[in-house]
Amino acid sequence: MRLLVCLVFLASFAMVCQGHSSGYTRPLRKPSRPIFIRPIGCDVCYGIPSSTARLCCFRYGDCCHLG
């Protein structure tokens, strides 16, 4: 009997981990805001003007440290 209870628990836990809840799975929702693609200057900060670095910092939150 303990083995049966353990197997049922493990099966239900596996279903929860896979996203099943009460036998119904909802479709994935789209993100509420659009995903912006960052310009390459935000990731590679060598040789870009300081105004571009500031723009990336304000718009995308990626602050380039020029040095």
From Swiss-Prot:
The cysteines joined by S-S bonds are 42-56, 45-63, 57-64
Q: Where is the signal peptide?
A: 1-19
Localization recorded for this chain is:
Cytoplasmic granule
Which is an annotated GO molecular function term of this record? chitin binding
Please list the coiled coil stretches: none
**What InterPro entries does its record include?**
Penaeidin
Sorted alphabetically, which keywords does the UniProt record give? Amidation, Antibiotic, Antimicrobial, Chitin-binding, Disulfide bond, Fungicide, Signal
Report the main location listed first in the record: cytoplasm
| Positions of modified residues (Leucine amide) | 66
Q: Which GO terms describe its biological process?
A: defense response to bacterium; defense response to fungus; killing of cells of another organism
Name the Pfam families on file: Penaeidin
Q: Name one GO cellular component term.
A: cytoplasm
Q: What does the function comment of this entry state?
A: Antibacterial and antifungal activity. Presents chitin-binding activity.
Family per record: Belongs to the penaeidin family.
Name of the protein in its database record: Penaeidin-4d
Q: Which organism is it from?
A: Penaeus setiferus
